[in-house]
């Protein structure tokens, strides 16, 4: 499916938090052709009450370039009218935002698929590394990638039915 080369695209890799409502407004304000805006917000979670913070490290130029590459693939696959991707780095506490994907399109299917595609690829391909900082003051280990994340990404590599 042809992407729209004039689609507004915003990619940010930063330490500062983001305002989800402001990002939705930025992509959709005064845009009457948009019929759907899908957002995904990834949060830092503490599954067992032991996590004080998650430290995200990255290669500055490489992270932005890889996310841009993934965004361009999404724009080629789905007819999007706007796309915003924000990924944070640094020390992030449980409950705080880590990543935001806002995908806008004329129809919901394209927006949902693009957001899902981008998250599946960012979980496995974006050059970010996570290390736990525990509530008792000790440094936890590096967080390994999960097999289910790899499986989710692989589904996008399978031949697609017409969309």
Swiss-Prot record:
Keywords, alphabetical: Molybdenum cofactor biosynthesis, Transferase
SUPFAM superfamilies registered for this protein in UniProt: Molybdopterin synthase subunit MoaE
Gene Ontology molecular function, alphabetical: molybdopterin synthase activity
Pathway per the UniProt entry: Cofactor biosynthesis; molybdopterin biosynthesis
Binding site residues for substrate: 43-45, 107-108, 123, 130-132
UniProt cross-references to Pfam families, sorted A to Z: MoaE (PF02391)
EC identifiers of the protein: 2.8.1.12
Family to which this protein belongs: Belongs to the MoaE family.
Record's protein name: Molybdopterin synthase catalytic subunit
UniProt organism field: Brucella melitensis biotype 1 (strain ATCC 23456 / CCUG 17765 / NCTC 10094 / 16M)
